[in-house]
C-alpha cells in the first residue's frame, strides 16, 4: 500500500491543506501548499469537450476517501457542483429496515416470493400434479380391466369344462334323410354297392340331395354291411374302386 494511503488510514483527520485542495481544486494557494506532497496526475474519468484534458488534480485514492466517511458527502457535493459534466455516483447505502426484512424472511418467505414472482414454476408444479392424477386413473382402469378379463376367463372355463372357447371343433350336422330317400338308397345299394359318378349324380338329382351326401351314405352303408358280413377283409379291387369313386366325385359343399 502507498505510504500516503497508510498515513490517511492511520489518521482519519487529514491535514487541512489536503481537504482545502479537494474543496477548491483551482485555488492557487491550496495547490501551492497541498500539492507539494502529492504528485500531479491527469484526472480522466470521461474526457468532455468542455473539460480540459490537461488539468491536473491530486490523486485522492479510495483508501484516503474511505478513511473519513463523515466527510465524503460534503466533498462529493462540492466536486459535483464544480464539475456538473460528470455523472452522479449512485447511493450505495441500503435502508436498514429493508435489509433486515430480507434477512428475516427465511426459507418460507423466500419460497413464497419465488412462487409469487414466478407463475411459470407454480404452473409447472400444478401440471405435474395433474399428470400424476391422470397416470393413477389409467393404472386403476387397467387393473379393473385385467381383473374383469380374469373373471370372465374363469367363468368360461367352469362352464366349458375347463376348455377355452373355440378349442373344440364344432361337429357337422348330420343329414336327416326322409323315409322315401332311405328306401331309394337301400334299393340302389342292393343292386350296386359302388356307384359311378354318373349314377351318383342321377340319384342326387332324383332325391334332391347333393353328390357328397349320396357318396357319404354309400360309404357308411358299405362299412355297416362289412361289419354285418362278419368282418371279412376288404379286397384290393373293392378298395381301389372306392378310392377311385371318392377321387372322381366333386365336392358339393
Curated annotation (Swiss-Prot):
CDD domains attached to this UniProt entry: homeodomain
Cellular component GO terms held in the UniProt record: cytoplasm; nucleus
One GO MF term attached to the UniProt entry: HMG box domain binding
InterPro entries in UniProt: HD, HD_metazoa, Homeobox_CS, Homeodomain-like_sf, MOX-1/MOX-2
Observed effect of gene inactivation: Mice display mild defects in sclerotome derived vertebral and rib bones. Abnormalities are restricted to the sclerotome and its derivatives and are characterized by a remodeling of the cranio-cervical joints, leading to the assimilation of the atlas into the basioccipital bone so that the skull rests on the axis. Mice lacking Meox1 and Meox2 show extremely disrupted somite morphogenesis, patterning and differentiation. They lack an axial skeleton and skeletal muscles are severely deficient.
SMART domains: HOX (SM00389)
Ranges annotated as DNA-binding: 170-229
Gene3D superfamilies assigned to the protein according to its UniProt record, in alphabetical order: Homeodomain-like (1.10.10.60)
Compartmental location: Nucleus; Cytoplasm
Signal peptide per UniProt: none
Pfam family membership, one: Homeodomain
Start-end of Basic and acidic residues biased regions: 166-177
Function: Mesodermal transcription factor that plays a key role in somitogenesis and is specifically required for sclerotome development. Required for maintenance of the sclerotome polarity and formation of the cranio-cervical joints. Binds specifically to the promoter of target genes and regulates their expression. Activates expression of NKX3-2 in the sclerotome. Activates expression of CDKN1A and CDKN2A in endothelial cells, acting as a regulator of vascular cell proliferation. While it activates CDKN1A in a DNA-dependent manner, it activates CDKN2A in a DNA-independent manner.
Designated name of the protein: Homeobox protein MOX-1
Species name: Mus musculus
